[in-house]
A protein has these predicted regions:
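Alpha-helical, hydrophobic structural elements that either
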Residues: 1-239
Length: 239
C-alpha cells in the first residue's frame, strides 16, 4: 500500500517494509468514508496514506477540499502538503498521500489530520458537494531507521554540522546564525553505486535550528549514501 506509492526497494527492502506503521482509523459521514491506513518515515518526516470512498450521489471526479495537519510540538517549524495520487473507479476509492516535516522529533508524538469538505473540481463554480470534517489523531510509533553523519565542514557562508539520512529524506543541519535566509541552496546526494536519486524538492528552513530538507521521489537506502553536494561542493562522510 503506502510502500507501493513511495517506491520502497533496495538492499534494506524488508527493513523498510517493516517500518510501515498501521493506523487503520475510519470515519463515515453521510456515506462518505475517510480511512487513514498507514504512516511511514523517520523522526522528522512522516508520510501518511489515506483513502476516501465516494458514495453514490457524489461526483467521483471530485476530491477532498482541504487537509489540515497539526502536531503538539511547540515551535516545531512544521510544514506539510498533500496530494491525490490515485483514483479507482471500480471501488469508488481515492488515495491520498500526506507528508509532514518537523524540525523537532515526531517520534512517539501525536499528530492530528483533518479532512474538510468534498468538492467537484469539474464544476466551474467549484462548489462543495459535501460539507463536513473528518478528524483523526494518532501517535507515531514506527521504527526509526535514520542514521546521522557528522561533518563540521566550514565555508565562507555556513558551517555544516551533520547530515541525517532516512529512507525518505536527507536533513542537513547548520550552525545557528551562520545561514542567510535568501541563500540559494542546490543539493544532491552521492551514492556508492553511482545512482542519483531524483530530488523531488528542497526545503530550506533557516529559523530555529537551520536545516535543509531534501525530499526524494523514491525511498533511498541510507547505507548507500556516502556524501552530499551543496552548491557544487562535495562533502564525503568519513564514518
Amino acid at each position: 500500500m503506502l510502500k507501493d506509492y513511495l517506491g520502497i526497494s533496495g538492499t534494506r527492502e524488508d527493513e523498510l517494509r517493516n517500518s510501515v506503521m498501521e493506523v487503520n482509523q475510519s470515519q463515515t459521514i453521510d456515506g462518505l468514508t475517510v480511512t487513514v491506513r498507514q504512516a511511514f518515515g523517520d523522526a522528522h518526516t512522516v508520510y501518511v496514506l489515506a483513502e476516501v470512498r465516494v458514495p453514490e450521489g457524489l461526483p467521483f471526479e471530485g476530491k477532498i477540499d482541504e487537509v489540515l495537519v497539526n502536531t503538539k510540538l511547540r515551535d516545531d517549524g512544521a510544514v506539510y502538503n498533500w496530494l491525490l495520487v490515485n483514483k479507482d473507479e471500480a471501488t469508488k476509492t481515492q488515495t491520498y498521500i500526506i507528508q509532514l516535516q518537523t524540525l523537532k522529533s515526531i517520534l512517539k508524538k501525536t499528530i492530528r489530520i483533518r479532512f474538510i469538505d468534498f468538492r467537484n473540481v469539474a464544476d466551474y463554480q467549484n462548489r462543495n458537494y459535501f460539507r463536513g470534517e473528518f478528524d483523526f489523531s494518532f501517535r507515531i510509533s514506527y521504527k526509526n531507521i535514520a542514521v546521522t553523519k557528522g561533518l563540521n565542514f566550514r565555508t565562507d557562508k555556513y558551517t555544516v554540522k551533520s547530515v541525517t539520512l532516512s529512507p525518505v529524506t536527507a536533513i542537513i543541519s547548520f550552525d545557528a546564525g551562520t545561514t542567510d535566509k535568501d541563500y540559494d541552496i542546490d543539493c544532491r546526494i552521492i551514492t556508492k553505486d553511482g545512482s542519483t536519486p531524483h530530488v523531488a524538492w528542497v526545503n530550506y528552513i533557516p529559523e530555529i535550528n537551520p536545516a535543509i530538507y531534501i525530499n526524494f521521489d523514491d525511498v533511498i537506502d541510507p547505507d548507500n549514501v556516502i556524501g552530499i553536494v551543496i552548491n557544487g561542493v562535495e562533502y564525503l562522510f568519513t564514518d
